[in-house]
Design a protein with these regions (language model features):
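Metal- or metallocofactor-binding catalytic centers and their adjacent structured scaffolds
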Residues: 59, 64, 69, 101-176
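N-terminal secretory signal peptides that target proteins for export/translocation
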Residues: 1-12
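Bacterial N-terminal signal peptides
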Residues: 16-28
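Shared catalytic-loop signature of beta/alpha-barrel
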Residues: 275, 286-404, 408
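Metal-dependent enolase-superfamily TIM-barrel catalytic cores that perform enediolate-based chemistry
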Residues: 190-298
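Structured beta-strand/loop patches that form or line metal/cofactor-binding pockets in enzymes
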Residues: 53-104, 109-117, 386-392
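Conserved, mostly hydrophobic/aromatic
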Residues: 105, 165, 178, 254, ...
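Signal peptide processing junction and immediate N-terminal pro/mature segment
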Residues: 29-45
Length: 435
């Protein structure tokens, strides 16, 4: 728990000293890169550009720090079931929560959302539970080392399950350090500007009403998930520009890759850049050359969806083709904090902004928020609406404070889960394993 102490015996101290010498020697011979990082300390150094050897004890394994219990929860509420495009059915969202406990009383927690078209399911819960024995048998608590091991031993695992494990291990390390995760990642700011990300509505007045409603909470920027039909979407843009011309608000549209090039060009041409600041996923993410053409011909910023294609190679291809004004991904969908740090390092080296996604429940929001706070190029935090629905089961899930989103107080992710209250959800499953 929070008051537990990390113990380092004399043998560990000797190992630590040897590692210092090894790292000093390696720094003098070759610069570290995020992709070549063999462990979390090297990854932190590559991302921040500063030495991180002082954090080595946080990831060190011993019998006292071994994982002794694994709990997995799948939680869903009808209040988060929603459409994100007029071309899709409503999605049922399951918040998959991983809780690991060590022999010396520390915890590591993560939350990863998964989406299902027909009904809530325990699919991700069961996949995550299939790794419980692997977690109890771990001989390392380093998320980079563990991630590499699982790629070899469990290559079939989804990126969402990898993210669950990776984020929980980063949370565990930050809790051992007794500091917020963003500080462990090198972040110095503790708040940023949010925007209200709205689900799909079936009528134009509902969009106007939603803007007015969420503006009362302090939001000044809003993202619309729309029909994916050019005529209806143009009518929405024109209505918003007429209604909120002098409001000082800013707007974004997420097309979920629904358009072809010509429709994307037409909609972007209608959008007044003084009000509309971003067009997300106008076309299929694979069409990098067409993205580059849209970017060169439109005033509004162009970003990809970032959900299905997010490898380092793809990020580099997007950079080489000048496809985007900003890249995009969600740490909970791409394999976790470790993968996100690798991609952020590539983007930062190329002066490419990354618009990190944070749609999801509070634990998923927090994981991405800590990354954003550590990455100065990321400007906006995406806050899913309806706001309270995504805070279900959390004691301090409200991250909004006077028009800013703030890092939760406390170590690690900083989110305090109401474990008993989770069982009141519309959909609830729990599995566990112990030593």
């Amino acid at each position: 728990m929070a008051n537990a102490e990390t113990r380092i015996d004399s043998a560990s101290a000797r190992m630590f000293a040897a590692l210092v010498c090894l790292l000093v020697a390696s720094v003098g011979s070759a610069p570290l890169t995020a992709q070549s990082s063999a462990n979390a300390v090297e990854l932190l150094a590559a991302f921040s550009g500063e030495p991180a050897i002082q954090y080595q004890p946080l990831f060190q394994f011993s019998q006292e720090s071994r994982i002794v219990a694994v709990e997995i929860y799948a939680v869903g509420t009808e209040s988060t079931t929603a459409q994100y495009s007029g071309r899709e059915h409503a999605w049922h969202v399951v918040n998959n929560i991983l809780r690991i406990t060590t022999a010396d009383g520390f915890e590591g927690i993560s939350g990863v959302d998964t989406y299902y078209e027909v009904e809530f399911t325990e699919q991700a819960l069961l996949e995550l539970h299939s790794v419980a024995a692997d977690l109890l048998a771990l001989q390392s608590l380093d998320p980079v080392v563990v991630g590499a091991m699982l790629k070899r031993s469990r290559p079939e695992l989804s990126d969402e399950v990898r993210a669950s494990i990776d984020i929980a291990l980063w949370d565990l390390a930050a809790r051992r350090a007794d500091r917020p995760l963003y500080q462990l990642l090198g972040g110095r700011r503790d708040s940023m500007e949010p925007y209200a990300s709205l689900p799909f509505y079936h009528t134009l007045p509902e969009y106007v009403d939603a803007v007015n409603e969420y503006a009362t909470l302090g939001y000044r920027a809003f993202k619309f998930h729309v029909w994916g039909s050019i005529e209806e979407d143009v009518r929405l843009v024109e209505l918003i520009q007429q209604t909120f011309a002098d409001s000082g608000y800013r707007f974004m549209i997420d097309l979920e890759g629904a358009y072809g090039f010509e429709d994307a060009l037409r909609l972007g041409g209608v959008m007044d850049e003084r009000l509309f600041i971003m067009l997300e996923a106008p076309i299929d993410d694979q069409l990098l050359e067409q993205y580059a053409q849209l970017r060169s011909r439109l005033a509004v910023a162009i970003v990809p969806a970032g959900y299905n294609i997010y490898t380092p190679e793809f990020i580099r291809q997007g950079i080489d083709t000048a496809a985007w004004d900003a890249g995009r991904f969600d740490a909970t969908a791409i394999g976790g904090i470790s993968t996100a740090l690798q991609l952020l390092t590539i983007a930062n080296d190329a002066d490419l902004t990354i618009d990190i996604q944070s749609w999801g429940h509070s634990l998923a929001q927090a994981a991405n928020l800590h990354l954003m706070l550590a990455n100065e190029r990321t400007r906006y935090f995406e806050a899913p609406m309806p706001k309270q629905a995504y805070e279900f089961g959390m004691k301090n899930g409200d991250l909004l404070d006077v028009g800013r989103v703030i890092a939760p107080r406390g170590s690690g992710l900083g989110i305090d889960v109401n474990w008993e209250y989770l069982a009141t959800a519309d959909f609830y499953r729990k599995l566990g394993s112990e030593e």
